[in-house]
Amino acid sequence: MEIKLFGKWDSETVTVKDPSLKSYVSVTPVLVPHTAGRNSKKSFDKSKMNIVERLANKLMANQNNTGKKHETLAIVEEALTIIENRTKENPVQVLVDALENSGPREETTRISYGGIAFLQSVDVSPSRRLDTAFRNIALGASQSAHKNKKTVAQCLADEIIFASKADMQKSFAVRKKEEKERVAQSAR
């Protein structure tokens, strides 16, 4: 018997195109993505956590959803169903594409030298790229659902679909990525 995510989607066929993210994007087959914090003890163990669970954890960062993992997993499952209905593709593959397109490759850091502070352009580690992508996707979904008739699941599905297409006009996460990279380019 093969294990499918939420009993619906096969994650064996999912491919990560970006070579730097291959070892950090975990699409290991799990029935319910809930590890109960087992991977939070060591620094880089979060790279072993399934990406759907990491997305659910970022959605829980909102003050209204803090600690409501079951509710958040239901939102993510509904969003993945919406993505599958709209795109007719594996929604886990669409999520991986969205993460690749919304993680910044370059950003700035503040350096002070002799009492003068200036910004210096630096490359971003793959782990930070993923963390930033998850944060921006979750933030974009919750902001677009605020004072809106659409549910959070519908807004999350929209955000993931637009980010997977790298649509800068409609995706909050891709817009933030482009903004960070533009600032980093000017700081070279």
From Swiss-Prot:
The UniProt keywords, alphabetically, are: Ribonucleoprotein, Ribosomal protein, RNA-binding, rRNA-binding
Q: What GO MF terms are annotated?
A: rRNA binding; structural constituent of ribosome
Give the superkingdom in one word.
Archaea
Question: Which SUPFAM superfamilies does this entry report, sorted A to Z?
Answer: Ribosomal protein S7
Known PROSITE patterns for this protein?
RIBOSOMAL_S7
Q: Which InterPro entries does the annotation name?
A: Ribosomal_uS7, Ribosomal_uS7_arc, Ribosomal_uS7_CS, Ribosomal_uS7_dom, Ribosomal_uS7_dom_sf, Ribosomal_uS7_euk/arc
Keyword match Manganese: no
Q: Give the record's GO biological process terms.
A: translation
Question: Cellular component terms, GO, for this chain's entry?
Answer: small ribosomal subunit
The role this protein plays is: One of the primary rRNA binding proteins, it binds directly to 16S rRNA where it nucleates assembly of the head domain of the 30S subunit. Is located at the subunit interface close to the decoding center.
Q: Which HAMAP family match?
A: Ribosomal_uS7_A
Query: How does this chain assemble?
Result: Part of the 30S ribosomal subunit.
Provide the family line.
Answer: Belongs to the universal ribosomal protein uS7 family.
What is the name of this protein?
Small ribosomal subunit protein uS7
- Please name the source species: Methanococcus maripaludis (strain C6 / ATCC BAA-1332)
